[in-house]
């Protein structure tokens, strides 16, 4: 006569040690055990999938890539929102908070001296600043306050 394997020797790949069940011969225990088994069998069961190392690595890389791809834009958006809430009082670095920069062509004089040769010189009004000697700061647009990184204007090519 064939007998079923003892429940105390039941082994599972998901359990580190053999399942140890109390050895009660009462009908209460066997009835409870059969109810639990019946309940377990009534739900869909996920069985272990045999995955090789390359598949596991590929899945991990895919999940991490998606997480990073979503996480970076979310991080930038929160930084922009937080920066907009903070007051910006840092003076502009190029113009030291004045809002104007000295003209690079005439060095702030408003006129350009050109040596024609033979000892002759000609003084003319600066074509860059129109004789004003200074220009509006291109970094802060004349406000004197250093713009935040994402608020800086983009310079377009003159093509």
UniProtKB/Swiss-Prot annotation:
Give the organism the record lists.
Solanum lycopersicum
Q: Which cysteines are joined by disulfide bonds?
A: none
**Matches recorded under PANTHER family:** PLASTID TRANSCRIPTIONALLY ACTIVE PROTEIN, PROTEIN DISULFIDE-ISOMERASE LQY1, CHLOROPLASTIC
Instruction: Share any extra remarks.
Output: Its sequence is related to the DnaJ family but lacks the J domain. The CR-type-like region is similar to CR-type zinc-fingers and was shown to bind zinc.
Keyword Transit peptide included in the entry's annotation? yes
Quick one: where is this thing mainly located? plastid
Q: Which SUPFAM superfamilies does the entry mention?
A: DnaJ/Hsp40 cysteine-rich domain
- GO terms (BP aspect): photosystem II repair
Q: What's the name of the protein?
A: Protein SPA, chloroplastic
**GO terms for molecular function, please?**
protein disulfide isomerase activity
Chloroplast in keyword set: yes
Q: Name one GO cellular component term.
A: chloroplast
Provide the tissue specificity: Expressed in source leaves. Lower levels of expression in fruits and stems.
* Regions that span the bilayer: 56-76
């Amino acid at each position: 006569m064939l007998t079923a394997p003892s429940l105390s020797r039941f082994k599972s790949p998901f359990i580190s040690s053999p399942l140890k069940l109390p050895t009660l011969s009462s009908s209460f225990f066997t009835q409870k055990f059969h109810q639990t088994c019946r309940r377990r069998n009534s739900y869909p069961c996920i069985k272990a999938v045999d995955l090789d190392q390359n598949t596991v690595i590929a899945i991990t890389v895919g999940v991490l890539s998606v997480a990073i791809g979503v996480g970076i834009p979310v991080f930038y958006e929160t930084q922009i929102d937080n920066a907009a809430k903070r007051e910006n009082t840092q003076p502009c670095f190029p113009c030291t908070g004045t809002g104007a920069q000295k003209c690079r062509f005439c060095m702030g004089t408003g006129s350009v001296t050109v040596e024609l040769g033979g000892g002759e010189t000609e003084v003319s009004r600066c074509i860059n600043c129109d004789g004003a000697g200074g220009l509006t700061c291109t970094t802060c647009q004349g406000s004197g306050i250093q713009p935040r990184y994402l608020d800086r204007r983009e310079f377009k090519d003159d093509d």
